[in-house]
Design a protein with these regions (language model features):
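Loop-helix junctions at membrane interfaces
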Residues: 1-190
């Protein structure tokens, strides 16, 4: 319940913080902590909460691009928002479990490796599925945004949509990996 509340608060706040034309995802860190503490299913559930808040931002117009997609096709917008969140949380949990618990021992080094790997995989899955969703489900909107920016679709996706947000999300997750290890370590010792 605590992780759910943290995710809701962080993502609502993030809905109003923009780096370039898009909002940054701040909720991946608590998803990673939940996935590390409670496993891949918990990561998927927490990712679903994150996706629901992102969808709410689209519906309420907090995310202007998301609002355009919602008005164009609510079902596909919900599919992208919820799907990318759920799968990012699931992937983080699976990667953490495979690395941190992959051997017979659950050492702090394995936990750190698992946290770092999960911290990389989660934003890659989140951003990757978002881009694939736009490319395959909303190509006319993606083309219009790219044309409006004077870019090709691929250039727009890489340099406008991914560059700033993805790098910031990745750095935040990597920095917080050490915090995640401490939380998991403290819990396993109690």
């Amino acid at each position: 319940a605590l992780m759910t509340a943290i995710i809701v608060v962080l993502q609502v706040v993030a809905s109003f913080v923009k780096f370039g034309p898009f909002t940054i995802t701040l909720a991946l860190a608590p998803i990673l902590i939940g996935a590390a503490l409670y496993g891949p299913k918990a990561g998927a559930c927490l990712g679903g909460v994150f996706g629901a808040v992102v969808l709410l931002a689209c519906i309420l117009g907090w995310d202007p691009g998301g609002a355009i997609l919602w008005n164009a096709n609510p079902f596909l917008t919900a599919l992208v928002c919820l799907g990318k969140g759920i799968l990012a949380g699931l992937a983080a949990g699976l990667v953490y479990r495979a690395i941190a618990w992959g051997g017979k021992s659950h050492s702090s080094g394995r936990m750190l490796g698992g946290s770092i790997a999960a911290g990389i995989v989660s934003p890659v899955v989140n951003t990757g599925l978002f881009l694939l969703g736009l490319f395959f489900l909303f190509p006319t909107y993606l083309e219009a945004w790219a044309t409006g920016a004077g870019q090709t679709v691929i250039t727009y996706m890489i340099f406008t949509m991914v560059s700033i947000n993805f790098v910031l999300e990745l750095l935040i997750n990597l920095v917080l990996s050490t915090v995640i290890v401490r939380v998991v370590s403290a819990r396993s010792h109690s």
